[in-house]
Amino acid sequence: YLSSGQEDLRGANGIVIVDGQVKVDGVSGGQELLLYKDGTIGTAAGVSASELVNRGVKYTFSCHSTQMIQNGDTSPSYREPKSYKRTCIGQTTNGDYYITTDLGYGNKLSSTAEYLKSLGCVNANSLDQGGSVTLTRNSEVINNPSDSSGERYVGDFLYFV
C-alpha cells in the first residue's frame, strides 16, 4: 500500500510518523505528505507530530510536498513560475490514487493539478522534483532521473502492491 522508507532516523528533518506512531517529534513544516488512516492525503503546517497522530495521520513522507487540490478546490499555493520534472499523487472520492511523473520540462503544477482534476481527483499533492523523480516498475527504473549523477537518494518512498 503506502509505506515510509525511513529506517535510520538519526538524520531525519522535521517530523516522522510511521504506522500511527511518532518516530521523530517536532512541528510539521507544511511540506510533508500526510496519509490519514482513512486514506486521505494532505499537508499541514505548524502542527506537532503528536497532534497529527491525534487527528488520524498514519504516515508522513518527507518530500517537499505542495498541496495542489484540497477537497476538490485548487489550492493557490501550487502556483509557481517554473516547470520541472516532478512526481504528483492525486486521490479520488472513492479512494483511488493516481501517480503522475512528468519527464519533460514543460509542465507546471497548475497544469498537472488540472490534469489530476480531470481524472476526478479531489486531493492532490506534488511530491518532489528533479533527480528524486524516479519511476520504477518491477524494481527497474523506467525513466531517466535528471540529476547528472543519476537517482537522488531520498528518505521516503511510495509503493503500491
Task: Please identify what each model-predicted range represents.
Residues 1-161:
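Gly/Ser/Thr/Pro-rich low-complexity, intrinsically disordered segments
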